[in-house]
Amino acid sequence: MLFRSFGTMTEGIFGQRRFLAIYLVTGFAASTASYVFGPLDSLGVGASGAIFGVFGAFIAYNLRRRNTVQGMAALRWAGTLILLNLVIAFGVRSVDWRAHLGGLVAGLVAGWAAEGFGKGEVRRYAPWIGMGAIVAVSLFAIVTRTTEIRALPLFPYL
């Protein structure tokens, strides 16, 4: 229910296409963080990392507006929700806090990129360059982690 209201606001800020890109890319980055930094004997599933990514994008958007009353109010609200959710994530053993943090960090980058940066043509393509960079870093991390795991004597079949 919380994501429905928060997600609707974020979609209104960035539009449907960018919102979908933020959700999918940050979900991928969150899963990557879980895989790269998690123990070998665990498997993370769920959409909470992508939801944290949307939170991160909302925060990035409002960080640029922190000198306005509305921007500061939005940052306080989002910050409180994130803090509460992170306390829960770290406190409950079955919650994958690595995915939550990975999604949040990716969301901050995605939100900054989705709004655009630079001038002229660069600004026009900036959202997609930023999303592509997140995916590229995630893929590099997956390849690196998989290579490390394959080198372990317990996993010769990977």
Residue ranges and their predicted role:
Residues 1-61, 65, 97, 102:
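Transmembrane helix-loop-helix
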Residues 67-90:
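Membrane-embedded catalytic cores of phosphoryl/pyrophosphoryl-handling enzymes
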Residues 53, 59-62, 71-79, 147-158:
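Contiguous hydrophobic segments
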Residues 18-22, 72, 76-80, 102, ...:
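Alpha-helical transmembrane segments of integral membrane proteins
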Residues 27-28, 53-56, 78-86, 131-136:
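Small-residue-rich segments of transmembrane alpha-helices in multi-pass membrane proteins
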Residues 86-158:
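C-terminal transmembrane module of polytopic alpha-helical membrane proteins
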